[in-house]
């Protein structure tokens, strides 16, 4: 494999010294970029974009041409696993992802096939290996999956939801059925992420996008415990380097202490949790990632710089000089001016030097 020219992202996740704060952005390859929209138009639709190796590689690399980012993230979707399990993923304009089938009964769970990620999701693995090769060691490549809880919400609801009516009904009325589904999904995610690592992913993020919809005990029982199982089942070293794992529960800032028990190397934060508070809670046991409100990028250059500097001041307030990766607190939105993220990225690199230089 090609020698990695910029490894500060991996080093920060492992709480090793860095020369400047590494940064990447959730959803950095996305609709806010005109070149992304052009490529998606060529592909025809979102799923075709994900499943075409050449297009998936192209859109992964696009933000790296514009911004001085310290990591690339595989362009794909968290719902590839449910799709491969036979639920029939499709997208309706303005309504987000939907499935032709739902999973709502014990028999539905029993009918789910065992995932063979290398065969069933070969297009993802082809994309990972192609992107890794195209990067040429420029920056590390992040692989990812949704958490079992988050995947289950889509599978039970049949698409996106704000109330999770059917999933929570299952959780309280038939918890054993939900546990069976989550266990099946945890095994699927382990296979999927290990296949990504074999294909060339150098770090992993688990997106627990809907963990924040749960009460405390339910979060631990139905989300966190399954992420713990996944991390215990992952290949943690490849080509002589550790494969760091990031857990990101949106709305999960109150659960940092239990999250540490997952075995993750780093915890992602949304913008509702102050970084200095989070630093004090984790006390150097894990790295942190985040957590600029994506809406900040709607502002002026001066307001973006001010917000980024305040974020970095919080991140380094307790004197720690590493164990931090700058990011947004959630995905960048399609309405952001492509000029604005450059201000974010450059300010992170320039201003953090006062703490790390």
Swiss-Prot record:
Localization per record: Cytoplasm
Catalytic reactions on record: uroporphyrinogen III + 4 H(+) = coproporphyrinogen III + 4 CO2
Any GO CC annotation of this UniProt entry: cytosol
InterPro entries in alphabetical order: UROD/MetE-like_sf, Uroporphyrinogen_deCO2ase_HemE, Uroporphyrinogen_deCOase
Top-rank taxon, per record: Bacteria
Binding site for substrate: 27-31, 77, 154, 209, 330
Keywords: Cytoplasm, Decarboxylase, Lyase, Porphyrin biosynthesis
Uppermost EC category: lyase
Claim: Methyltransferase is one of the keywords in the record: no
GO molecular function: uroporphyrinogen decarboxylase activity
Pathway: Porphyrin-containing compound metabolism; protoporphyrin-IX biosynthesis; coproporphyrinogen-III from 5-aminolevulinate: step 4/4
CDD domains documented for this protein: URO-D
Pfam families reported in the protein's UniProt record: URO-D
UniProt keyword Endoplasmic reticulum, yes or no: no
Assigned protein family: Belongs to the uroporphyrinogen decarboxylase family.
Quaternary structure and partners: Homodimer.
Matches recorded under PANTHER family: METHYLTETRAHYDROFOLATE:HOMOCYSTEINE METHYLTRANSFERASE RELATED (PTHR21091), UROPORPHYRINOGEN DECARBOXYLASE (PTHR21091:SF169)
Function per UniProt: Catalyzes the decarboxylation of four acetate groups of uroporphyrinogen-III to yield coproporphyrinogen-III.
Name assigned to this protein: Uroporphyrinogen decarboxylase
Species for this entry: Acinetobacter baumannii (strain ATCC 17978 / DSM 105126 / CIP 53.77 / LMG 1025 / NCDC KC755 / 5377)
């Amino acid at each position: 494999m090609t020698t990695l020219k910029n490894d500060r992202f991996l080093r920060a996740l492992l709480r090793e010294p860095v020369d400047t704060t590494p940064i990447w952005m959730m959803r950095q390859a996305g609709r806010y970029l005109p070149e992304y929209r052009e490529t998606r138009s060529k592909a025809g639709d979102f799923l075709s974009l994900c499943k075409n190796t050449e297009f998936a590689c192209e859109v992964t690399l696009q933000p790296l041409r514009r911004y001085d980012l310290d990591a690339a993230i595989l362009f794909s979707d968290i719902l590839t696993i449910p799709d491969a399990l036979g639920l029939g993923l499709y997208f309706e304009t303005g309504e987000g992802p939907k499935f032709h089938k739902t999973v709502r009964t014990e028999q539905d769970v029993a009918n789910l096939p065992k995932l063979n990620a290398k065969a069933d999701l070969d297009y993802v693995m082809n994309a990972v290996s192609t992107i890794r090769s195209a990067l040429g060691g420029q920056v590390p490549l992040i692989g990812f999956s949704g958490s079992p809880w988050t995947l289950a919400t889509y599978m039970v609801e049949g698409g996106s939801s704000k109330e999770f009516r059917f999933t929570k009904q299952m959780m309280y009325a038939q918890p054993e059925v939900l546990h069976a589904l989550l266990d099946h999904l945890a095994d699927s995610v382990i296979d999927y992420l290990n296949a990504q690592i074999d294909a060339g992913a150098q770090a992993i993020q688990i997106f627990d996008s809907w963990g924040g919809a749960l009460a405390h005990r339910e979060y631990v029982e139905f989300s966190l415990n399954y992420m713990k199982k996944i991390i215990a089942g992952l290949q943690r070293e490849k080509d002589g380097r550790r494969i760091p794992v990031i857990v990101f529960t949106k709305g999960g800032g109150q659960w940092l202490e239990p999250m540490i028990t997952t075995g993750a190397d780093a915890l992602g934060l949304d913008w509702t949790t102050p970084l200095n508070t989070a630093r004090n809670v984790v006390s150097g046991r894990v790295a942190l990632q985040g957590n600029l409100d994506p809406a900040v990028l709607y502002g002026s250059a001066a307001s973006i710089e001010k917000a980024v500097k305040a974020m970095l001041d919080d991140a380094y307030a307790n004197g720690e000089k590493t164990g931090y990766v700058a990011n947004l607190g959630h995905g960048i939105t399609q309405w952001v001016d492509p000029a604005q993220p450059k201000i974010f990225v450059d300010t992170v690199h320039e201003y953090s030097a006062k703490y790390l230089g």
